[in-house]
């Protein structure tokens, strides 16, 4: 008898109860998240007196960041508070996990404190899946980045940003540039872009920083920056993740910038109205020139702003679905 595989992110009715990866989400589901996020963008308006909605009132959200983060943790905290949730940020270095307590023991103890949602960043790929399999049916898990595997909310906010500026995914050429081998953002972006119907996704980088199997994912591979950027509509720059590299994969940061840094001259090879994105943190003078990062085609700060609304949408959607 054939065993039926069920996506662990979904309820029996196919609704989103956890967000663990963009892989496996339908185009309709991704579009629903983006549409929901658009309703929350107005809450960020500086002219708005009331910036909260009561969607998660009475719910407890635990931010569990086992890796350092500023941008992601802060935007999740703001998102949860704007949904009226009670938020607890666990200080991992001061917690029992640094004294040898297992991940699941930590989850059990926090669940006993009536946690309703865990937002998890972990160095081990698959850690959020393990937690999602372990928690009670009413508890929700959102992956805020696991190892090299996935960063689904970053992928979704990138798609929101692209849709905001470019409207139609089916008419775009998108280039992802840099350390794709170690990038969970790149994996999430590629799955989202192909699911949303982008006809041409390009990966640009040195051979040592591009994983095998990109072509099987429908990605065109370039090892020359000038060739890869020609006529693209969106450029997504990635930082060098030196903390995940084992061994000398590059000669030097200066040599990398010389070959793959995004300069105004190289950006001129893209479409005239191309936008430049970066998930952060940026390494100026390594993967991107300051003139580009701060230039008129950069939408990097828009990504940060939209990230709050997208994370509000994800939290609101999963909180409404349980088995």
From Swiss-Prot:
Catalytic reaction list: carbamoyl phosphate + L-aspartate = N-carbamoyl-L-aspartate + phosphate + H(+)
One GO MF term: amino acid binding
Biological process per Gene Ontology, one example term: amino acid metabolic process
Pfam assignment, any one: OTCace
UniProt pathway annotation: Pyrimidine metabolism; UMP biosynthesis via de novo pathway; (S)-dihydroorotate from bicarbonate: step 2/3
Residues where carbamoyl phosphate binds: 71-72, 121, 151, 154, 280-281
Enzyme Commission number: 2.1.3.2
Entry keyword set: Pyrimidine biosynthesis, Transferase
Entry GO CC: cytosol
Binding of L-aspartate, residues: 99, 184, 239
InterPro entries: Asp/Orn_carbamoyltranf_P-bd, Asp/Orn_carbamoylTrfase, Asp/Orn_carbamoylTrfase_sf, Asp_carbamoyltransf, Asp_carbamoyltransf_Asp/Orn-bd
Family from the record: Belongs to the aspartate/ornithine carbamoyltransferase superfamily. ATCase family.
Assembly and oligomerization: Heterododecamer (2C3:3R2) of six catalytic PyrB chains organized as two trimers (C3), and six regulatory PyrI chains organized as three dimers (R2).
Function of the protein: Catalyzes the condensation of carbamoyl phosphate and aspartate to form carbamoyl aspartate and inorganic phosphate, the committed step in the de novo pyrimidine nucleotide biosynthesis pathway.
Alphabetized NCBIfam families for the sequence: asp_carb_tr, PRK00856.1
HAMAP family to which the protein is assigned, alphabetical: Asp_carb_tr
Protein name according to UniProt: Aspartate carbamoyltransferase catalytic subunit
